[in-house]
From Swiss-Prot:
Binding site for heme: H24
Xref: Pfam families: Cytochrom_B559, Cytochrom_B559a
Gene3D superfamilies: Photosystem II cytochrome b559, alpha subunit
Domain of life the protein comes from: Eukaryota
Molecular function as annotated in GO: electron transfer activity; heme binding; iron ion binding
Name of the gene encoding the protein in the UniProt record: psbE
Name used for this protein in its record: Cytochrome b559 subunit alpha
PROSITE patterns: CYTOCHROME_B559
Organism for this UniProt entry: Cyanidioschyzon merolae (strain NIES-3377 / 10D)
Comment on bound cofactor: With its partner (PsbF) binds heme. PSII binds additional chlorophylls, carotenoids and specific lipids.
SUPFAM superfamilies associated with the record: Cytochrome b559 subunits
Cofactors required: heme b
Transmembrane segments: 22-36
Amino acid sequence: MAGGSTGERPFSDIITSIRYWVIHSITIPSLFIAGWLFVSTGLAYDVFGTPRPNEYFTQERTQIPLVNDRFNAKQELEDLL
């Protein structure tokens, strides 16, 4: 091995190999499709607790739910809900 070499396979060898592209031609589109399904089915809203676009404003509350005092934020949030 040459000085300073970590013994790892060179990146140029990896990306020019058939094995690399066989594996990644499956995994990259699969990750894209999984992400698209995660968002389009609404599961992302449920997992992260984010309100859906039609849930930001209710019939009773038509203004922005804004917290003004960070020291009393819990009380302000309870009042907003």
